[in-house]
Amino acid sequence: MRYNPALDGLRAVAVMLVLAFHARLFGGFGGFFGVDVFFVLSGYLITRILAEQHAATGSLRIGAFYARRLRRLYPALLLLLAVYLAAAPWVFPEHANHLRDAAVAGLYLSDYGFALWRVPWYLQHTWSLSVEEHFYLVWPMVLMVVFRLPRHWWAPAVLLLAIAATIWRWHVALNDDAWYHPYYRFDTC
């Protein structure tokens, strides 16, 4: 896939929205929108990469795809967790579960950990990495099924999946006491 500098511009806007949200600028507006932009960009890029691979080879090399994703994202997460584990006992001495929280984040389970158990408390910002990693695990398998359909069924199949996902997200948002579940749980993103 060719490099597209416009996508870097969108990433920059998304970063600014997230930073503005956490700095409480603009009344806290824009943070979730910025994360949504990241998710859409990631979904677009991953779908395009996998679709181009399928068009070129007639198959998907999912193992190689997973290995690339892990090599790209995991080193930075491990560095963050190492720094956290080294500093957290002194910076957050009142919190006794640093190792548990790092394990939850390191296993890309922060989205469920926070939604279900309110952990990892000081690493809750890793929820978006968890959601993205879960997407990386599921989406290639969904595309494998879609690519086995006749080509004229591809768009309707993906549209049907999007509609079903939207209905499920609305259901959870309207019938769950926790407002944050639609953001933090993979099954609603």
Predicted regions and their residues:
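Hydrophobic membrane-embedded alpha-helices
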Residues: 3-4, 13-189
